[in-house]
């Protein structure tokens, strides 16, 4: 009995003009997700998904490449304007934002949504290099 061939389903073009770019920049990686106004993901990318490994994932250049890739995917769905939500303490925050702007998006607002504790959990120790 022959196994049925799995078909690769191509995603249809969504024609969404505005959305939200969530830039999550940690100490180890930078992840960019572009969603519509309801929060449904349109496109995503990360430094690790673009082939950077180890400590190179946390560089601003890796964040820039990931943001350019995510922007290209979102523009295929007709996206033109973005609100940007930046989260996290990593080094890829500004470079990802600059890459989204250079890709041709009109950025309407930039928000920092990094969670700040009101003296919650004990933070990890500071690195001594």
From Swiss-Prot:
Record-level GO cellular component terms: ribonucleoprotein complex; ribosome
InterPro entries documented for this protein: Ribosomal_uS11, Ribosomal_uS11_bac-type, Ribosomal_uS11_CS, Ribosomal_uS11_sf
Statement: the UniProt record of this protein carries the keyword Disulfide bond: no
Gene Ontology MF term list: rRNA binding; structural constituent of ribosome
Gene Ontology process terms (BP): translation
Gene3D superfamilies: Ribosomal protein S11
Subunit structure: Part of the 30S ribosomal subunit. Interacts with proteins S7 and S18. Binds to IF-3.
Protein name: Small ribosomal subunit protein uS11
Protein source organism: Allorhizobium ampelinum (strain ATCC BAA-846 / DSM 112012 / S4)
Lineage: Bacteria, Pseudomonadati, Pseudomonadota, Alphaproteobacteria, Hyphomicrobiales
Gene behind this protein: rpsK
């Amino acid at each position: 009995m022959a196994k049925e061939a799995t078909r690769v389903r191509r995603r249809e073009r969504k024609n969404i003009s505005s959305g939200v770019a969530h830039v999550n920049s940690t100490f180890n990686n930078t992840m960019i997700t572009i969603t519509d106004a309801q929060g449904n993901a349109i496109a995503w990318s990360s430094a690790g998904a673009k082939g950077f490994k180890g400590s190179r994932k946390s560089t601003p250049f890796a964040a820039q490449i990931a943001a350019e890739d995510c922007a290209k995917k979102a523009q295929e769905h007709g996206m033109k304007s973005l609100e940007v939500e930046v989260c996290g303490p990593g080094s890829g925050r500004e470079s990802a934002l600059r890459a989204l702007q250079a890709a041709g998006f009109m950025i309407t607002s930039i928000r920092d949504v990094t969670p700040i504790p009101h003296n919650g959990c004990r933070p990890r120790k500071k690195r001594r290099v």
